[in-house]
């Protein structure tokens, strides 16, 4: 067995508080304890700390010792067991092909996670353990309690500052989130709690258009680059900067073991595209895929704790010819795999024909569907075509089938869409897919900016998030060019946090503006450190400031390098206010000298 040090598994990952912030915990019922982040302001501000949503997990709590070889504390395990509807069992044996045809001695692979649980949980016979099932029965789970506190994020403290001036396009965002509201949104299928019973380390979160807009970050090894140390750190790094979920899109060797390391150390939901690993098991030959291989892969990943699966069940045989005249054809990896299988066998997609079988598996572990858009447009010229919308209609049909089994569903969306075609995508999804949460990749609004596609896509992401998309899948500067590294992940996450927040502001989320206004006051009052700390990326903000004004004293200066001390507009405005205030005092004195009468007698 390979030694950890030999395989470059990190003994540590990025930890410690985000600068200017501290981890706090808000207590709820039944032992619920919700992590949040507070940004402390300078005493001169005379303001309360700014409380913000936090998905960085224990990694930013200095009081918690992180040992990735031990994994995180199983936060939800007691809640799961207390419901009395699960059982442990002897899990499937790990096979060489699970790790990409590695030999039995694991030579050339990464070390397995220490003390792997070979007795996963599943629903007892006849039971259904999904959050949707509980919600339909009127049950408020501990997960729902946790989410309500988390989504409110101190709204009660900000009650006086609430502003509802946005355009929500029909979304129903209450002033305060209650556990019962969370339950009802889950029961109606308008929101998803992605929380596999075998991933108890995950902190409950919700994806739905009546909640904060969430973002996902993609990580993963590939056939040409595979380093589990980098993948674990990418996950930690992504959630540090605000990724609400992470998808492991590994396509190379060591897939199973890499995923185990990530899951055991992830406080956020983990999603996968199971067809990628299934393809590895048949040596990359799409035609050799079978339902049996795919089913085995689903169970393998379910036992590990994957929280949501992208399933390309909407790529039907009849739709494939509709892509023939596209500029870029089928750009989805999963979509192209299934299209090739359908054409090779001239049969209907086995993910479609076995969809109810997939539902039976998912409801035993509470895994959510992320119904894949395998026919999404790969360029703006292909946007909103017959192939794309035919698949979307099918995803709506499959959503109804999943809900019949009380399996949670979200719908994946494009892609590449010019700005004027974005809203029709959202409107059509709400109708065709019965208001199931929309989860979109961007969309990219132009195709001319390789190297800057985090920007081209953030434009579309902000717009579609405003219109109602529940979760945005990030795009990094490396999109279409190569695999993102650690720095690319940060840029992608911060860019998409910006897009999601802009959408929350536009939707009229009651306290979304609170952080903006706190930063604006800090900017006007030249509280530089508060400006840095309130930003989405404090390190970069301070670094840019210090490139021209590196002296520590410059952080107390009432100007910046752009205007200089003589031409700072905000400094001049402050002086104008002082002069105006002084003038008002003089007029007040004159008023008092003349007896304080409102109406003076007319002069004779």
Swiss-Prot record:
[4Fe-4S] cluster binds at residues 560, 563, 568. It comes from the Bacteria. Pathway: Cofactor biosynthesis; thiamine diphosphate biosynthesis. Its cofactor is [4Fe-4S] cluster. It catalyses: 5-amino-1-(5-phospho-beta-D-ribosyl)imidazole + S-adenosyl-L-methionine = 4-amino-2-methyl-5-(phosphooxymethyl)pyrimidine + CO + 5'-deoxyadenosine + formate + L-methionine + 3 H(+). One of its GO terms (cellular component) is cytosol. PANTHER family: PHOSPHOMETHYLPYRIMIDINE SYNTHASE, CHLOROPLASTIC, THIAMINE BIOSYNTHESIS PROTEIN THIC. This is Phosphomethylpyrimidine synthase. It comes from Zymomonas mobilis subsp. mobilis (strain ATCC 31821 / ZM4 / CP4). The gene is thiC.
């Amino acid at each position: 067995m390979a030694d950890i040090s030999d395989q470059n598994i990190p003994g540590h990952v990025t930890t410690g508080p985000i600068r200017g912030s501290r981890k706090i915990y808000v207590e709820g019922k039944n032992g619920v304890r919700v992590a949040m982040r507070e940004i402390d302001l300078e005493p001169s501000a005379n303001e309360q700390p700014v409380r913000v949503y936090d998905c960085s997990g224990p990694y930013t709590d200095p009081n918690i010792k992180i040992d990735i070889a031990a994994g995180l504390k199983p936060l939800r395990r007691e809640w799961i067991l207390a419901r009395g509807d699960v059982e442990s069992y002897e899990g499937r044996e790990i096979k060489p092909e699970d790790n990409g045809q590695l030999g039995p001695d694991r030579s050339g692979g990464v070390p397995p996670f220490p003390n792997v649980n070979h007795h996963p949980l599943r629903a007892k016979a006849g039971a259904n353990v999904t959050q949707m099932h509980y919600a339909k029965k009127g049950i408020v789970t501990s997960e729902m309690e946790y989410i309500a506190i988390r989504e409110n994020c101190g709204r009660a403290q900000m009650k006086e500052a609430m502003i509802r001036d946005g355009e929500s396009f029909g979304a129903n965002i209450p002033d305060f989130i209650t556990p019962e509201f969370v339950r009802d949104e889950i029961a109606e299928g308008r929101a998803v709690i992605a929380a596999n019973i075998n991933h108890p380390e995950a902190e409950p979160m919700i994806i739905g258009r009546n909640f904060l807009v969430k973002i996902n970050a993609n990580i993963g090894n590939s056939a040409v680059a595979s380093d589990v140390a980098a993948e674990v750190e990418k996950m930690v790094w992504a959630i540090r900067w605000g990724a609400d979920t992470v998808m492991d899109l590994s396509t190379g060797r060591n897939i199973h073991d890499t995923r185990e390391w990530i899951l055991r150390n992830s406080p956020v939901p983990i999603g996968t595209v199971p067809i990628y690993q299934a393809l590895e098991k048949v040596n990359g030959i799409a035609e050799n895929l079978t339902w049996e291989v795919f089913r085995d892969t689903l169970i393998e990943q379910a036992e590990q704790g994957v929280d949501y699966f992208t399933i390309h069940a909407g790529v039907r045989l009849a739709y494939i010819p509709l892509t023939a005249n596209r500029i870029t054809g089928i750009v989805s990896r999963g979509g192209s795999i299934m299209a090739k299988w359908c054409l090779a066998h001239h049969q209907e997609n086995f993910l479609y024909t076995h969809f109810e079988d997939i539902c039976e598996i998912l409801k035993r572990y509470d895994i959510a569907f992320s119904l894949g858009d395998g026919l999404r447009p790969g360029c703006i010229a292909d946007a909103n075509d017959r192939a794309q919308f035919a698949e979307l209609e099918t995803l709506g049909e499959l959503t109804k089938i999943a809900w019949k089994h009380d399996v949670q569903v979200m719908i994946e969306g494009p892609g590449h869409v010019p700005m004027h075609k974005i809203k029709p995508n959202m409107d059509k999804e709400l109708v065709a897919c019965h208001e199931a949460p929309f989860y979109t990749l961007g969309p990219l609004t132009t195709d001319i900016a390789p190297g800057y596609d985090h920007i081209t896509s953030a434009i579309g992401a902000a717009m579609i998030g405003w219109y109602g998309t529940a979760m945005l899948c990030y795009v990094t500067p490396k999109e279409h060019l190569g695999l993102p590294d650690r720095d690319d992940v940060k840029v992608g996450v911060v860019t998409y946090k910006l897009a999601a927040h802009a959408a929350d502001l536009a939707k009229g989320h009651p306290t979304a503006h609170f952080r903006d206004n706190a930063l604006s006051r800090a900017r006007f009052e030249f509280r530089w450190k508060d400006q840095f700390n309130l930003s989405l990326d404090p390190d970069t903000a301070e670094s840019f400031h210090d490139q021209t004004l590196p002296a520590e004293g410059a952080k107390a200066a009432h100007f910046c390098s752009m205007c200089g001390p003589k031409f700072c507009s905000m400094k001049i405005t402050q002086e104008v206010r002082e002069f105006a205030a002084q003038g008002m005092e003089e007029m007040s004195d004159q008023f008092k000298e003349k007896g304080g009468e409102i109406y003076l007698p007319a002069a004779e």
